[in-house]
Amino acid sequence: TINIDSQKVWDRMWKHSVVAGINWKKEGFEQKRRELTNWRNHSSFDSTTYPGGLYEINKGATNNLALFVQDTYRPNFNWAIYTGLRIDRFKKFDGQHVTYDTTNNRYDTVNHGEGSYTEWSPKLAIEHYVTDSLNVYASYGHSFNPPPLSQVYRYTDVVRANPNLDPERSDTFEVGMKKEWGTKTALNLSAFYVKTKDKVKYVTHYDNNGDVDYKMY
């Protein structure tokens, strides 16, 4: 995994505070599944059926580049306005599923297709300080959540990979209030609504007998 993050802050610019930054993250994995003669000994490869006990290989990679900027504007002591914008460029690639064919004594390879996504994520929030101890706020934000590698490319005995899994996209609306009594007592109340597209769910699939066949995100 490679993760590079950098940001710059411009503070007190004509009642504005601005933060801008960049984030780059690249992940990759390779999963090798082997048959063992002794499950307690991870080196006890069973080569009677599979070469070196190796019966399956799964691998893949993701890359995400994000640029963002956020501004905090305080026109006076009673109001604060927060605006922000983020752009993500996400790509999944090099997905591969390799299994050993015991009939023909060979490895068969399935190459998963690539997927690229570009998403703009704005946000806006307004906060009003009614008194020194009471403030109310309203906010909207859009979020972009790519699935982890384990959901896209990794197989287990029960769970199948889903290389066609798309990132989640959500819009969140929230209103709330914060009240303080002295330095030890506070009350926070909020109500929010979230609308999600391409929500990732853990789904169980059954065979014709009603038994669990496999699970998938």
Locate predicted features:
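Flexible, surface-exposed loop regions and adjacent strand-edge segments
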Residues: 1, 31-44, 97-107, 152-161, ...
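Hydrophobic, lipid-facing positions within transmembrane beta-strands of outer-membrane proteins
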Residues: 2-6, 63-69, 120-124, 161, ...
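Membrane-embedded beta-barrel scaffold of Gram-negative outer-membrane proteins
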Residues: 129, 135-141, 145, 166-217
